[in-house]
Amino acid sequence: NHMGVLGSDNAWWLNVLEHGPASPYADYFDIDWYPLSPQLRGKVLLPVLGDHYGQVLEEGDLKLCFAPEQGEIYIQYLENSFPVDPREYPRILDLRADILRTGLGTEHPDTQELATLSDALRRLPERYSAEAESRAARVRDGTVYRRLLAELCARSPEVTAFLQENIMLFNGHPGDAESFDSLHQLIEAQAYRLAFWRVAADDINYRRFFDINDLAGLRMEDPAVFGDTHRLIFRLLSEGRVNALRIDHPDGLYDPQMYFRRIQAWRDWR
């Protein structure tokens, strides 16, 4: 019925935060992508902040980070990591590009490859594409481009240092509100909206387990969701390593009767 989210270890949820409605897992979670609030259209509200967003931002508690080994850019808040939409990577890759060209040379292969990667990332399909092929291409190609960025950083310490310096420029300086403008604009461009935890009761747009923000509801009535979430369980049953199941909180399911019937027919779902 629900799954732990809001940490940094749920690959499905992180994929949704990265790609929004284009994620192959967007329909796995019970998310209202078109709530009444126009600020949340196509976004997931994340009520994880300990204070109002503006206050947290200007205190420097939201940090833009870069992991060169994975070619990933993300936003860090306490123990939570939030992926950055790969289509927005050029904001960082293109910053001060003239400095890299001056240092390495315009014709240097690393300079040219970074520019090529930035252009490719910029051309990724948007999160809101209605075409299944475009959504799949976005996720697939975004992963490929991140890997290529990681490979470039692995062989070019100059590019790695350049990108890390750009990241530092985004992070601003507490006491200087304008220094956080670029980071704010980047956060606003994501498929999620970071918010004070107290707003969850009124604004949250994903189903939770009771009122626990980090337990997001799953659409277990969807056969694909049921199959993927129960694959390990059914394998353990077939291997004889499990001989009984305890079903907790079935009343929270969309269709409890259907769920029990599928469980009883578990051999058909292996």
Predicted ranges, named:
Residues 201-218:
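N-terminal small/glycine-rich loop or linker at the start of catalytic domains
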Residues 223-238:
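Short, acidic/polar
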Residues 1-201, 239, 249-270:
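Acidic/aromatic-lined carbohydrate-recognition and catalytic surfaces
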